[in-house]
């Protein structure tokens, strides 16, 4: 049985409708000092988020759990002596899920080896990741992948670590496109010289026991990003567990179909000095078979590797409300307005934490519909999670505690050893380029549509019929509001024909339905919450 058990589209089921809600966590040493204790406490944090994860009928098979850490250089130097690894940062590690078909695995490995050579990098070797399947659930065990790591050395001509990250990305994308065309299944959980992801169809308690690497004292990192997945209305699988390659995500992207279509439409217009002639090799940017979280990760990864700072890319994808905010600086408003013409917001209840291995950020959606709280300690640690209490901290060691506000960002720079505030990082991004000047010179706006005078109907019933009012609208909704001054109560069910199939006249609004995960989305009041609401699309 393959590790990927995702069903194909059939009947009323469509994979693109899937969303999930989860628990996220970050534990980091602000000065960038790596230790095994951070990994252990990250795993403990993950276990504390167990109640935010899901399980199937098999209680030992979770919806997914995992963690992202920095490349544990000392650990790999010890365990991969025969590979003669170069210094830290001069090699990348790919963590790969293969099917248990040995012939298929060898074929894919051979092709990856070929791509590494073609892209001018050095194949250092392969390693089978030791795992313990004894304590995982039956369903997880039946679909358990064969986990391997590939080690790739950087060409001597590459001195910029971002250029090396970009080359690893080019190798990965070509391998994925080749395998998809041949209907071969494999999955890179990560391929980077900075970070590595250990995850799977596991419960939080199983991650440490399943991946034996994590138990070694030489397995160190300056941060741990952890995630416990709850599949609200999705099918769990090994590759859909988090972390993704750049981010962890709690929530759902309600605008996914539009984001996906616009990204695909713009790909033919992409020009990149960073990628150069390699750009066609990495298309398409989004993995159409991925979840909403993985597609958001695909977009963030591409923009970062194309040269934008992680915070810049995050501000493009998940902007704070700007069109109705009178208190926003003109420079920041110009930044958001400029980028709104390039990229539609990936909107929906969202809390994400993201990293490129050097900077770690966290951001909330414009409505603040997902929780994210954090502590900063006097001994230079930060703890961020969906809730407090995930790691024990003595009260006297707490420097300060806070929560992320709607649309706001938190950024940690491990190289500078400090936390950068939302105001500072966004001011830096807004002043980096003359965005207002570019808007004045290049933005083409359409004149506003003037409202035409319509025929006046004095009769109330005629007006109500014209606008599609029904008996239920008047007597069940309006009358209670007028006579009793309270909102009427009603069920969510609606067994009337869809407007497009009805023989009766309908209100224009009845012809449109919003796609979203009903389970986890609270109602939005576009009038009272005008600041965070926009009709611009």
Kindly give the residue locations of the regions a language model identified.
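Conserved short alpha-helical segments that host acidic/polar catalytic motifs at enzyme active sites
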Residues: 1-536
